[in-house]
Amino acid sequence: MSNDHRNLESEMPVLPNGPINEESNAIDPCAREFVAVQGKMQQEQPCHSVQADFERLFRAEESSEQPTTVRRELWSYYLYYNGDNGVGPGSYTQALFQWALNGAGWQPGTNPRKPCSNSSPCVVPWAGGTRSVSSVVLIANGLCFAFMTVIFVWFGSAADYGSFGRWLLLVLTVICWCLQYGMMAIKRPTQWPAAMGMYVTAYVAYGATLVFYAAVFPRLARYMPHVQKAREDLKNGEINQEEYDAIESLERNHISNIGYLMTLLINLSVLLPLQHTNYSNNLALCLTNSYWVILGIWWFIFQQRRPGPKVPKGSNYATIGFKQLWLALREVRSLPQTFLYFVAYFLLADGLNTTGTLVSIIQNNHVSFSFLQITYLGITQSACSIASTFGFWYIQNHFKIRTKRMFLVTNLFSVLIPLWGMWEFYFYNVVFGLFQAPYYAYAQTMVSELMPLGYDNMFFALFGITNRASSIIGPNVIQAIINSTQNNWMGFPFLFSICVAAMIAVAFVDVEKGREDGRRFALARTTTRLSDESSLDVGKNGFYTTVGEQSNDSGVNGGIDGISYR
């Protein structure tokens, strides 16, 4: 055996249970152990580690040669985001569904049955008994979030591999488009079961498009030309990691903060001349959906191909999500700040999503399901949204304020909504636009800052699960309260309490520590992968070995005495 090979062995001390981890002086039971057999170095009893499983299932390798984000791709992203604004599936469709319910219902305790008024309690037949209209709408929302959770667990992580994410977003988008056009057929109150089915399915597809589309923006921002230059400056030591993180974070906020005023203004062209026509609401929904189709199609044309790696062996697109979720829960200690944020956001999303639904139910009753009045309220909200998103972005950019601080400011005012109850609907939409629009932007920016590089779809899927799964709880609790009291306002105290608890938890999230945890997380798993793939050829003496993590990198691409590393 050559002196060089002896030196290699001396740098990789071996004990009966594996090499020593030099940093902790602890024995690593899953490190590789080597012996010489018939002139070759062989590994004894390979260890199957959780970390190796994690690397194999999670790591979606991102090549540094990914295409640079170009202007038409960026603007097609803006246009899709603008079209996928929720006015159709989240506002108009729910209002049409609630209109059908209200028309089919009656005032409880009346005989003969009296039709529901805007201010009276209203019940509909449900499972052999009766249930309030507000309760049924909240049940439908709970079903939406339950189905979304299943989708995110099932397919969320699979979007990291190959071109699956690209095609998944296309399919979900087309489903949502078709069902919104289908809602145009809802003309009579007796059609409320069909309206409920289409509303739930369309809203599930819409919610899923938001999550899988949001997973694109960290990579889109990362490959903006000036962000790429900043990454090169970081490699060359011209800027530090903190400065680079600030540049990338601000670009993420810039891409995510887009309003949706135009779709509501366009709808006025239908709603104003046809405001006394019953079918005007359906036409407005058609116009809203067509607006999304016209703006959204360009993303699927101009999006550049950035395929991920192949699905790991032993997994497929249908199973990898469940495997990853199980392993992610086992690895929770590796990213404590990220998962603390997920817990906080679980509560916050539950409170604010359910608050929004409850306010919409009350608001729809108050305006007698008039799409024109709903549009005026939406214009108020979206105008404030546009002003606030760009205003918040300017303030953050000018004063170099961290995302967490901006997020806490938006949280403070958002929490006031369930505290007050917000019966003044125009003022509610002003507050919502000014503070909840940037809240959503900062919420997804926070998770993008806390997640390890290369695990975008997986962590955005977990983020989506946190957002949607949490909202299974709120609607079910609130619908039970409302059904028992026949008073919509009694749901707000519960919502306020969980929002306050969430805000306190967010305050304890250390973003800098979480970002560093994410780097170590990705580096450790990349090191494991490279260690598994690296090998050593000893051409002179005929040796071949696979080198473990404790090997030295000296001699790479050349070596001494015929030794070459690869």
Q: Where are each of the predicted segments found?
A:
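Intracellular loop-helix junctions on the cytosolic face of multi-pass helical membrane proteins
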Residues: 2-73, 184, 188-190, 194, ...
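Short amphipathic helix-loop junctions that connect adjacent transmembrane helices
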Residues: 91-134, 357-374
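Transmembrane alpha-helix termini and helix-breaking/packing motifs in multi-pass membrane transporters
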Residues: 97-99, 156, 266-280, 393-398, ...
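Helix-to-loop junctions at the C-terminal end of transmembrane segments
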Residues: 148-164, 387-404, 482
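Structural signature of the two symmetry-related core transmembrane helices
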Residues: 167-182, 405-419
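Intracellular helix-loop hinge segments at the cytoplasmic ends of transmembrane helices
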Residues: 212-219, 361, 441-450
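C-terminal transmembrane helical hairpin of 12-TM major facilitator-type secondary transporters
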Residues: 404-440
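A late C-terminal transmembrane helix in Major Facilitator Superfamily
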Residues: 457-483
